[in-house]
């Protein structure tokens, strides 16, 4: 095989692996996150938010609100409107969230202590779920049942950084 063919094959394999990793969460995972309970094969587990840590100088001067999930730090990082979710020591910017909706919604900030935090496992996939109702206000009026959600796909050991998804849904 010549060098050009090897390069093309390597590139195709890389793209296929990246696409598989960044696959959107299933409907069961999204529903488990919104409803706060297991759905189908998506196993939902709450993250205790009654024990909160904070760090006013987290990685590059971010202010962090931290919880523990599976022995690891998870949470919310704030700095000059460049907020993000935390997994271990990695900050995943909200603005990089992949939309779950069409047309896509603009990722929204939220107050971490007012949100519901959980983990969801489906097969070999694991997610951190953050479900929030726009700081207790909903969208307004008849839209009080509208919630925002972030699902952060947790990479398997030794893999790339987490992938973040964002959506807005109505809770029934």
Regions found by a protein language model. Give the residues of each.
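Bacterial N-terminal signal peptides
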Residues: 9-16
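Exposed acidic/polar residues on beta-strands and adjacent loops within beta-sheet cores, strongest
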Residues: 22-172
């Amino acid at each position: 095989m010549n060098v050009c063919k090897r390069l093309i094959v390597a590139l195709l394999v890389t793209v296929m692996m990246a696409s598989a990793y960044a696959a959107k969460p299933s409907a069961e995972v999204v529903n488990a996150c919104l409803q706060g309970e297991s759905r189908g094969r998506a196993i939902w587990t709450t993250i205790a938010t009654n024990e909160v840590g904070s760090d006013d100088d987290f990685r590059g001067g971010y202010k962090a609100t931290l919880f523990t999930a599976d022995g690891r730090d998870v949470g919310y990082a704030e700095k000059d409107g460049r907020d993000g979710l935390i997994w271990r020591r990695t900050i995943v910017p909200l603005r990089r969230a992949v939309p779950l909706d069409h047309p896509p919604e603009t990722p929204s900030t939220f107050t971490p202590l007012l949100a519901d935090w959980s983990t969801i496992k489906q097969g070999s996939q694991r997610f951190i779920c953050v479900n929030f109702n726009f700081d207790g206000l909903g969208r307004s009026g008849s839209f009080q049942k509208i919630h925002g959600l972030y699902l952060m796909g947790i990479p398997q050991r030794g893999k790339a950084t987490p992938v973040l998804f964002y959506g807005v849904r109505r809770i029934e």
